[in-house]
Amino acid sequence: MNLLVVGSGGREHAISKKLLESNNVENVYCAPGNDGMRLDNIQLVAISETDKAGLIDFAKKAEIAFVIVGPEVPLLEGVVDALEEAGIKAFGPKANAALIEGSKDFAKQFMEKYAIPTAASKTFTDYAEAKAYLDERGVPIVIKADGLAAGKGVTVALEMEEAVLALKDMMLEEKFGDASLKVVIEDFLAGEEFSLMAFVNGEEVYPMAIAQDHKRAYEGDKGPNTGGMGAYSPVPHISETVVDEAVEKILLPAAKGMVKEGRYFRGILYAGLILTAEGPKVIEFNARFGDPETQVVLPRLESDFAALIDALLHNEKPDVRFKKSGITLGVVLASAGYPEHYEKGNKLTGLNDVAEDVAIYHAGTKQDENDDFISDGGRVLLLAKEAETMTDARTLLYPEMQKLDNPNFFYRIDIGTKAE
């Protein structure tokens, strides 16, 4: 089989690498991909992730068996719809189902309708009304841009000053453009966060091993929200009972509800959850693999990944098995200044010194004219290591991160400490 992955980040690197482990996969192409993927025999195709005609044309020429669409933007722009209309099998929700990620307001109304546990919230398009509601609710409070903002459109405000600033940025300064013309204000939930992703086909839900992401930029969960600074899987302090409850009360009702709404969901449903005193509740839904969670969850998949996706695309029951022992830890190397203002084009040092048994997933990198890797984004790459315990994983992984030390980049040194 020849397969095509759409996207260019660390998530797509992990997806492509896992597909290449499958028995009957010959070639994996990534459009547009990044230069670091080539090191794992992934073939790059110079087509943008939203170029529907280009993707269709290539898929036909290269005799692609199926396409996996990685990021949220092409999903919401209807890339899966276009591929399927052209007779090409594609894994990922169509645009009308991807709305569960594309609009926080839609997701909130949907959860309310289907009694899926989440924080109380209200949606606003008028700044004065939103500000009045903020004054009434007080802090801590959470303010979210309705649309896509690359994981940065959420402010968890502990002080009123911070809340008002976030609201002004979104509604008056239009910090996220059209994405923040509508704003969701929701109650703050206290508890332990975790990510639960599942393979979904209509009403069928096949959960993956859970992961814990680290959203804040700096140690001790301080600083602004990012796309994610590191992750690990599984999460030893979240019990199987809690995960089962989340599948029963959140994922299954969501999958069934989407079918009822005429928004048949086939793809990855990602639930960002928080374990509160009343049980697990939804912080957010995403319509695709999480990044960086994918880089620590997919390596733990024991079943044949390509066969699994192929089964779902043929409405067959997939074989979904994850490793039961050990833990996988991943730490992101980011450009200094991320998630705000950062430079591109800084040379990466020490990459060739990283131990062979440590996985390198490239995200914001490219090669210069001397074939040296330079930065090309906020999150540059992720190193991942599997070990028996978290203490072992941290002891083995962080010396490898230190090989990449460079004033132009930074990483969090506390990823995984909660699981020790």
Curated annotation (Swiss-Prot):
<dbReference type="InterPro" id="IPR016185">
    <property type="entry name" value="PreATP-grasp_dom_sf"/>
</dbReference>
<dbReference type="InterPro" id="IPR013815">
    <property type="entry name" value="ATP_grasp_subdomain_1"/>
</dbReference>
<dbReference type="InterPro" id="IPR020562">
    <property type="entry name" value="PRibGlycinamide_synth_N"/>
</dbReference>
<keyword id="KW-0460">Magnesium</keyword>
<keyword id="KW-0464">Manganese</keyword>
<dbReference type="GO" id="GO:0004637">
    <property type="term" value="F:phosphoribosylamine-glycine ligase activity"/>
</dbReference>
<keyword id="KW-0658">Purine biosynthesis</keyword>
<dbReference type="InterPro" id="IPR020560">
    <property type="entry name" value="PRibGlycinamide_synth_C-dom"/>
</dbReference>
<dbReference type="Pfam" id="PF02843">
    <property type="entry name" value="GARS_C"/>
</dbReference>
<feature type="binding site">
    <location>
        <position position="284"/>
    </location>
    <ligand>
        <name>Mg(2+)</name>
    </ligand>
</feature>
<dbReference type="InterPro" id="IPR011761">
    <property type="entry name" value="ATP-grasp"/>
</dbReference>
<dbReference type="GO" id="GO:0006189">
    <property type="term" value="P:'de novo' IMP biosynthetic process"/>
</dbReference>
<dbReference type="InterPro" id="IPR011054">
    <property type="entry name" value="Rudment_hybrid_motif"/>
</dbReference>
<dbReference type="Pfam" id="PF02844">
    <property type="entry name" value="GARS_N"/>
</dbReference>
<comment type="similarity">
    <text>Belongs to the GARS family.</text>
</comment>
<dbReference type="GO" id="GO:0005524">
    <property type="term" value="F:ATP binding"/>
</dbReference>
<dbReference type="InterPro" id="IPR037123">
    <property type="entry name" value="PRibGlycinamide_synth_C_sf"/>
</dbReference>
<dbReference type="GO" id="GO:0009113">
    <property type="term" value="P:purine nucleobase biosynthetic process"/>
</dbReference>
<keyword id="KW-0547">Nucleotide-binding</keyword>
<dbReference type="InterPro" id="IPR020559">
    <property type="entry name" value="PRibGlycinamide_synth_CS"/>
</dbReference>
<keyword id="KW-0479">Metal-binding</keyword>
<dbReference type="Pfam" id="PF01071">
    <property type="entry name" value="GARS_A"/>
</dbReference>
<feature type="binding site">
    <location>
        <position position="286"/>
    </location>
    <ligand>
        <name>Mg(2+)</name>
    </ligand>
</feature>
<dbReference type="GO" id="GO:0046872">
    <property type="term" value="F:metal ion binding"/>
</dbReference>
<feature type="binding site">
    <location>
        <begin position="134"/>
        <end position="195"/>
    </location>
    <ligand>
        <name>ATP</name>
    </ligand>
</feature>
<feature type="domain" description="ATP-grasp">
    <location>
        <begin position="108"/>
        <end position="314"/>
    </location>
</feature>
<keyword id="KW-0436">Ligase</keyword>
<keyword id="KW-0067">ATP-binding</keyword>
<protein>
    <recommendedName>
        <fullName>Phosphoribosylamine--glycine ligase</fullName>
        <ecNumber>6.3.4.13</ecNumber>
    </recommendedName>
</protein>
<comment type="pathway">
    <text>Purine metabolism; IMP biosynthesis via de novo pathway; N(1)-(5-phospho-D-ribosyl)glycinamide from 5-phospho-alpha-D-ribose 1-diphosphate: step 2/2.</text>
</comment>
<dbReference type="InterPro" id="IPR000115">
    <property type="entry name" value="PRibGlycinamide_synth"/>
</dbReference>
<dbReference type="InterPro" id="IPR020561">
    <property type="entry name" value="PRibGlycinamid_synth_ATP-grasp"/>
</dbReference>
